[in-house]
Amino acid sequence: MKMIKGPGIFLAQFAGDAAPFNSFGAICRWAADLGYKGVQIPTWDSRLFDLRKASESQDYADEIVGTAAEHGLAVTELSTHLQGQLVAVHPAYDAAFDGFADPAVRGNPAARQAWAVDQVKCAITASRRDRKSVV
């Protein structure tokens, strides 16, 4: 990148159950209306992004990038903040960190770690797919 194109926004802090914060297209429109040029997508929030699908489908990745582009936005990052923290959790913090995990693996540190590693791997693959769509 030879120049900064403008401000980006991390969507996780705004995602919610009410419009315009409950779908990727609507939250992109909202961000663009505020003057943002890029969005960082939280990969753990299925209201906005299906991480597994993005890791398996170039068409879905193209759709996500296209939706952002329709609003004059670029996908700047796929965030794995929460999943990444769960890759290696000290036993003293098991209870505190368990809430970040998928409900199916809570209370099982080994399953939680395997889930987290898989999530990060999916994000790596999805990120490669998204990059194929970005000019």
For the regions a protein language model found, what residue spans apply to each?
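N-terminal pre-domain/capping segments
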Residues: 1-132
